[in-house]
Regions:
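N-terminal transmembrane signal-anchor/hairpin module of polytopic inner-membrane proteins
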Residues: 21-22
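Extracellular/periplasmic, surface-exposed regions of secreted and cell-surface proteins
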Residues: 1-15, 25-231
Length: 231
């Protein structure tokens, strides 16, 4: 089974102040225009296998998933209109500001899962996945996460038949790890520069943050044991 999901946003914004009244009268009017686009897609493929043989039941799944996001922004502001009613930047005399930005993010995952039960009494599950995120340096890009779980439906045992008031008595235990790549920046492993330091006719650059190639996946581990009864 394969699935493809696509999201696309295209936003246009305009802010205009006439040159006759208000705060913009001192600058002979003001016009700001901005365009923002965002495209993201998810593509996953899953293979499943199920088999029941007498009291044995097996369910296996393997899969692959890829997600990519691209954001683009472009905006500018100008002042100094000869008269009102002009809504194009080219009609104004003075450039007050302009900026643009592009962000990219991608994550690729390989995953697997196995579920097994015998006689609807003894259950076992295992999963493993590895995820690669563009937020990290190539030497630390991939994280590995897995889980194990088991449960015993005690109420299905023959020695429990005399306790007919117990519908479901279960003992469960599991261990698992999960990963998180949401570290607040798409490019924290790289050195980042502020390119808006102009002096005269030439633009300059100043370092904003140093590279950190040692950034890795945040990993959370969970353990639990549950004893449940229902009548």
């Amino acid at each position: 089974m394969a699935n493809l999901g696509l999201d696309y946003f295209n936003t246009h914004e305009m802010s205009y102040s006439n040159p006759y009244t208000g705060n913009a009268a001192t600058t002979a009017g003001s016009l700001t225009k901005a365009v923002q686009r965002q495209l993201s897609y998810t593509f996953n493929q899953l293979l499943t296998y199920q088999r029941n043989i007498r009291s044995h039941s097996l369910d296996v799944m393997i899969g692959h998933e890829y997600y990519e996001l691209k954001q683009q922004f472009l905006g500018a502001q100008k002042t100094g209109f000869p008269f009102g009613g002009l809504y194009e930047l080219s009609a104004a005399a003075t450039l007050s500001g302009a900026s643009s930005q592009t962000d990219k993010y991608a994550i690729e995952s390989f995953l697997s899962r196995v579920n097994y039960n015998f006689a609807q009494k003894y259950y076992f599950s295992a999963s493993f996945r590895t995820d690669g995120s563009s937020r990290f340096h190539k030497d630390s890009r991939w994280g590995k996460f897995w889980s194990l779980g088991t449960s015993w439906r005690i109420s299905e045992e023959s020695f429990m038949k005399k306790y007919d008031w117990v519908n479901n008595l279960t003992l469960k235990a599991s261990f698992g790890s999960q990963g998180n790549d949401n570290i607040g920046s798409y490019y924290a492993y790289q050195s980042l520069y502020n390119m808006g330091l102009s002096n005269g006719s030439l633009n300059g650059a100043g370092i904003n943050s140093l590279e950190n190639k040692d950034l890795k996946w945040e990993k959370n581990e969970n353990y639990f044991v549950i004893f449940g009864i229902a009548s």
